[in-house]
Amino acid sequence: MELPPQIQAQLMQLQQLQQQLQMILMQKQSVETELKECKKALEELEKSSSDEVYKLVGGLFVKRKKEDVKKELEEKVETLELRVKTLEKQEEKLQSRLKELQEKIQKMIPTAQ
């Protein structure tokens, strides 16, 4: 059975939305992983009794003040948390659009037969 062009177009749009959602989910997972690493680094930094620590910069370890590194990590955590929230909002919008489109397609299919 050949689907009408209108349904085919809707199915293509559905597929594009699914791909967008997959990309958002992959980005979110990546950002969440980086966020966990930053939080773990902050935890380890808190355990250190030294005023100076070594930070990896472009393949080299550079001695830095503990407070400077801590501040950088806290800012990075804040930025990453914001990014996760943004991605979650995008994910919710895409999920909603996907659901609406699926319902629309299901309503169209019985009329096409």
UniProtKB/Swiss-Prot annotation:
Q: Which UniProt keywords apply?
A: Chaperone, Cytoplasm
Q: Which GO terms describe its biological process?
A: protein folding
Protein localization: Cytoplasm
User: What InterPro entries does the database record attribute to this sequence?
Assistant: PFD_beta-like (IPR002777), PfdB (IPR012713), Prefoldin (IPR009053)
Predominant localisation class: cytoplasm
Alphabetically, the GO molecular function entries are:
protein folding chaperone; unfolded protein binding
Pfam families linked to this entry: Prefoldin_2 (PF01920)
Q: State the protein's purpose.
A: Molecular chaperone capable of stabilizing a range of proteins. Seems to fulfill an ATP-independent, HSP70-like function in archaeal de novo protein folding.
User: Which NCBIfam families does the record associate with it?
Assistant: gimC_beta
| Known partners and oligomeric status | Heterohexamer of two alpha and four beta subunits.
Q: What is this protein called?
A: Prefoldin subunit beta
Q: Which organism is it from?
A: Methanocaldococcus jannaschii (strain ATCC 43067 / DSM 2661 / JAL-1 / JCM 10045 / NBRC 100440)
